[in-house]
Regions:
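Metal-dependent phosphoesterase signature
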Residues: 1-20, 25
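Short, surface-exposed alpha-helical recognition segments that flank or form part
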Residues: 6-10, 31, 67-68, 260, ...
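Short clusters of hydrophobic/aromatic residues that line enzyme substrate/ligand-binding pockets
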Residues: 9, 63, 180
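Asp-based, Mg2+/Mn2+-dependent phosphohydrolase catalytic module
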Residues: 20-23, 36-153
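Hydrophobic beta-strand core positions in alpha/beta domains
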Residues: 30-31, 109
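Phosphate/ribose-recognition catalytic cores of enzymes acting on nucleotide-derived substrates
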Residues: 154-313
Length: 313
């Protein structure tokens, strides 16, 4: 039953980018999973090119013990003729981190459960998502796709009525945000990592504006729910609660982070705004200002399919 759904499961943000980057730089990679080998093959066959990208694939049924035992990782290193001490493991689970460390390898944790980073302290590094990976820290070729402090992402599009948020944007931060009802976008948000993004915002009766947006739990305020908080980089004379807001999210700036003070949080938000302002003038991002999705009233629900909206350009 589960195998029928694997084709609907998208890769984690940044996974395709990382795999292709390592392949193009001739860095051997392997899949080492607690799943059976047949299940691994079925899963990766749903992602174009993945089978050809990996030098080795090891399932739990091919070794004596699965994770947290090191057997899977040691077998993967053996098949690649690699010294375990020269291997870098990227893991999203605690048993996987334990297995990698037990194998004598370097381990980066990318927790799959929100707000669980403290549990992964045994890893050599903890990152919010694969978008935040810096390969050069581990002696690997660096990415060359960052543009003016930003990273292009496959555009995605959401829209809905502007609602009142926590009241912190204007009153506490001096930064008015145009909040959207996150519960309407649970499926979309589950596909995208928390962090600071940017793009274009269309207001049904006003026009199209540059925007920077946070998605996540806001560690400084310790939110209990994942939120979407766009900041339209324009001065408005009045509120626009209830107006239809459409967003084209086209780039990524950084992971969400905690800050030692309110002042440092505000300073960083303004810096994010300046980065977004400059980046959106670049042709790679500026072209999305003309997306029909930003100008046409929403027709079916509150969420647009990113690929379909992009094809309309």
């Amino acid at each position: 039953m589960f195998s029928e759904q694997w084709g609907n499961i998208k890769a984690r943000p940044g996974a395709n980018r990382l795999i292709k980057h390592l392949k193009s730089n001739r860095v051997p990679t392997a899949v080492a999973s607690n799943s059976s080998r047949s299940n691994i093959d079925s899963k990766i066959s749903c992602h174009q090119g993945w089978k050809e990208y990996f030098s080795a694939i090891v399932g739990a049924d091919e070794v004596q013990k699965g994770k947290p035992s090191p057997d899977i990782f040691l077998e993967a290193a053996k098949r690649m003729n690699a010294d375990p001490s020269n291997c870098l493991v990227i893991e999203d689970s605690l048993p996987g981190v334990s297995a990698g460390k037990a194998a004598g390898m370097h381990v980066i944790a990318v927790p799959s459960v929100p707000k669980s980073s403290d549990e992964f302290s045994s890893a050599d590094e903890i990152i919010n998502s694969l978008l935040d990976l810096r390969p050069e820290k581990w002696g690997l070729p660096p990415f060359n796709d960052w543009i003016e402090g930003t990273l292009q992402v496959e555009p995605w599009f959401i829209g809905g009525p502007v609602i009142k948020g926590f009241g912190r944007g204007s009153k506490v931060l001096g930064i008015p945000t145009a909040n959207l009802p996150a519960e309407n976008f649970s499926d979309v948000l589950s596909e995208h990592t928390s962090g600071v993004y940017f793009g274009w915002a269309g207001l049904s009766t006003r026009g199209i504006y540059k925007m920077v947006m946070s998605i996540g739990w806001n560690p400084y305020f310790d939110n209990t729910e994942k939120t979407i908080e766009p900041w339209l980089l324009h001065g408005f004379d009045e509120d626009f609660y209830g107006e239809e807001l459409r967003l084209a999210i086209v780039g990524y700036i950084r992971p969400e982070a905690n800050f030692p003070s309110l002042e440092s949080l505000i300073e960083r938000i303004h810096e994010d705004g300046r980065i977004a302002e400059r980046a959106l003038d670049l042709p790679e991002y500026a072209k999305y200002k003309d997306s029909p999705y930003l100008r046409n009233p929403l027709q079916q629900g509150n969420v647009a399919n990113g690929n379909e909206a992009e094809q309309e350009l």
